Amino acid sequence: MSYCLSEILNNQGVRHREFPVTRDKIFLGHAGVAPLTRAAAQAVQDYAWEITENFQEVGDFFSNLQRTRQLASDLIQAKPEDIALIGPTALGLNLVALGIDWSVGDEVVYYPQDYPSNVYPWSDLRRKGVRPVALKPENPGQITPELVMASLSSKTKLVALSSCHYLTGYRLDYQTIGVELKKRGILFCLDSIQSLGATPIDVQFIDFLSADSHKWLLGPLGAGIFYANPALYDQFHPPLLGSWNVHSPGFVAQEEIRFHSTAQRFEIGSMNGLGIMGMKASLEIISSLGVEAIQSRLIFLHRSLRSKLQSLGWEVLSESYPESALSGIVTVRKWGSDLNEVYKKLTDAGVVVSLRWDANKNPLIRFSPHFYNLESEFDQVISILKG
């Protein structure tokens, strides 16, 4: 099915049909767990019934896997054979942390105020004699190329960052960082869950990427993608082994451990069929609309919502960000206000947002609209906040 952004925005019937959550909710929580689209839910249901009544033909299943790899590879400028269909995001990040051949004294650069899944795999490397080097930006989440470059040394082996900070919404200039790291022969790992489906990504600037589908991709929990630069396969040993990623003819264990030559080497066992079918349907939507158009829409919505919230006296964390750093995340605070009460008021009115806290335990409210949200919904939010 083909999707048209203008039709989604201007035809309420189409919008309600394809994005059922819009029927009775104002959903502004896509940086958390996004609602499934009609297409994704239908794909999951169809697959469930198929394996209930008929058991899907193996050939059909592999055809769907290949189509999913193709869609995902187009989204990140990779090849289909370089896409592993695994989730959640933390699994891919841990594959990197555990698969690199570390030496005592090696350094990994990371941001300790990132989402925990992109912190613990790196800080835990102390057990292997690796030194985690913590980035300390002047403002939370604002990781700049200059900050990253200043943290490097002759012992830096990997830089592990998020393409977009989960709390502040600051979008990383990963391309500039990636170019400089390649010049120095330093590996670059990107947690892209807050960008996949919202922002164009090009893996030529990075070495590893991991992202689940349940946020901006509008897919199910636990279905995601993992990318590793194939040029690194010989020096990057998959740390998890099973019947799927190691050559096992006829499912018979072999004496020699020989990994597949494609990204299948990172898929250790039975595939998440239900999740992958849902993710495939969501990828079809993103592909049809075009991620560049989605990004433009999100920046427009960001500016609109930010302006409306500022008019009520809310402090918006992204108010000084350049446009290149804007995302679909608009996080606010208001000193002296009970944000728990504000969150409850919004929730009771059918507005879905996220209540979060910064490193100093100060409460924040995070809004994260997607392309199908309307400015009129923002006006309703403002009316609720005024009331």
Briefly describe each language-model feature range.
Residues 1-387:
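Pyridoxal 5′-phosphate
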